[in-house]
Each structure stands twice: as structure tokens, then as C-alpha cells.
A protein has these predicted regions:
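Fe(II)/2-oxoglutarate oxygenase catalytic core
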Residues: 1-84, 90-116
Length: 116
């Protein structure tokens, strides 16, 4: 999947940039709008270019906690437990406030040399 995603976005030499991150959002938990990419050039290469989120929780076990993208026609993806979504790390995104239950996910970043 990573190679297809990298080719789709036109990136070469993709690699895992850091260890995977387990995230847990209990009731009231959220993560506001942000980009995963280092747009200010503060981090050493490899730079994040593709982000991936795997939903670990069963969607029936929590309410809210939608992964949203700041794009035209913003419609949150409806992931099932164990499904992954890949997206460009420069796209602003957030996790809405969890209203009930706990949302768990695994997040990974893939990158390569700095953009030219």
C-alpha cells in the first residue's frame, strides 16, 4: 500500500520516519487542526510526506472522534476496525471530540528527502 500511496503522491524513496504512535482518545478527547508535515524545516530528514491512521477501535464502541480533513467537500471517512487511511502529511486534519467511549488508533508517518 505504501508504494502505491507514494507513487500516487509522486514521492520516491519512502521509508518509515519514526516509531508508530498509539493514540487513545477517551470521552472529551480530541486533536485540533494540524499538519503532520514539517513545513518550517525544523526537523532533520527524512521528512514526513505520507501519514497513515489505522482505526483500532470498533466504531460501535465510541461516538464522535471523527477524523476530518480540511478539504473542499470535507466528509469524514467512515473507517471500520482495522482499516487504514493514507493521506498527504501536508493536509490539515483533526480528530473531533469523542462524545462516548474510547477511540484508539495507530498512526505512522512515511517520508524521504526534503522537498525541493
Amino acid at each position: 500500500m505504501l508504494f502505491r500511496s507514494g507513487n500516487h503522491f509522486g514521492y520516491e524513496g519512502m521509508q518509515l520516519t519514526e516509531p508508530a504512535q498509539f493514540t487513545e482518545y477517551p470521552k472529551g478527547g480530541f486533536y485540533d487542526w494540524h499538519m503532520d508535515a514539517d513545513v518550517n524545516g525544523q526537523f532533520e530528514p527524512p521528512v514526513r510526506k505520507i501519514s497513515m491512521t489505522i482505526l483500532l477501535s470498533n466504531p460501535s464502541e465510541f461516538e464522535g472522534g471523527d477524523l476530518e480533513f480540511m478539504t473542499e467537500g470535507n466528509k469524514p471517512p467512515q473507517l471500520l476496525q482495522g482499516q487504514a487511511i493514507f493521506f498527504c502529511s501536508m493536509i490539515r486534519h483533526r480528530v473531533n471530540k469523542v462524545k462516548k467511549g474510547v477511540r484508539r488508533s495507530l498512526v505512522m508517518w512515511f517520508g524521504g528527502p526534503p522537498f525541493k
